[in-house]
Regions:
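All-alpha amphipathic helical-bundle segments outside canonical DNA-binding/catalytic cores
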Residues: 111, 147-154, 171-187, 240-241
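Amphipathic alpha-helical segments used for helix-helix packing
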Residues: 112, 125-149, 199-206
């Protein structure tokens, strides 16, 4: 008997029929554990998008690296672009969740800012795939980030966290440089991002290996001390209004 086609007369894919087939093709264990299936697809997709970028990634390659089918990727995510947005949302969500787990209230403003800088450094250092994803999304002018309904809400808490530390520092008289939370965040991120994103070129041009354990320890200390010292400067020049 001829099987019904997933394509409508107008040539478009019948997603309802396609989803039914996708579920039917899954092993029974995977039908019972959709969250694990989705998580596995996201894990493989993250590695693939980080490796070759959005333009270079192929759904067929992601399918081949998972124990699932191409139909299931479309079932869970809708398509390559939606899958990429989901990867970005998870990548940003992971670091934001770790930041929110920090208990900084019992620390002095200086120690709190130093601790946040150390965490930011460590996360970037341990997750080069995050660096590559963000760099590639900037190549695409953040078009996929703008398509996400979640990323704005996911990322706003870090500014509140930094602002709280700043407010305590100003109140206690230990921070003198008047800055915005977004300025601290972008400066801290830039210092941690560059040492991972530019390791290869810096080593090739200057012979300076930023990935060596010794250099890593030195740079972690520099960045963790630099941010609080910058805020503590008693002669900061013209303050930000």
């Amino acid at each position: 008997m001829r099987q019904p086609s997933d394509h409508r007369p107008d040539g478009r894919i019948d997603m309802a029929n396609s989803k039914v087939k996708a579920v039917q093709q899954l092993p029974s264990e995977r039908q019972r554990d959709p969250e694990r299936t989705r998580a596995e697809i996201l894990k493989v997709a993250t590695a693939e998008f980080a490796r070759v970028g959005y333009s270079g990634a192929r759904v067929d390659n992601i399918t081949a690296l998972t124990r699932t089918t191409k139909r299931m990727i479309y079932y869970y995510f809708g398509g390559k672009e939606q899958l990429y947005v989901a990867v970005l949302e998870q990548a940003y969500g992971d670091i934001r969740a770790i930041e929110q787990e920090l208990d900084l209230k019992h620390l002095s403003p200086v120690e709190a800012m130093r601790t946040l800088a150390e965490l930011t450094f460590d996360y970037h250092d341990k997750h080069p795939e995050f660096i590559r994803l963000v760099a590639d999304e900037n190549v695409h002018n953040a078009e996929h980030v703008r398509d996400s309904e979640q990323l704005g809400g996911l990322n706003s808490p870090i500014l509140g966290l930094i602002q709280n530390i700043l407010n305590r520092g100003y109140r206690d008289g230990v921070f003198h440089r008047r800055v915005k939370a977004i300025e601290v965040h972008t400066l801290m991120s830039a210092l941690c991002f560059y040492r991972v994103s530019n390791q290869a070129t810096v080593k090739a041009i200057f012979g300076y290996d930023m990935s060596s354990p010794t250099t890593r320890r030195r740079q972690r200390l520099f960045i963790a001390e630099m941010i609080p010292s910058w805020l503590q400067d008693p002669h900061p020049g013209r303050a930000t209004k």
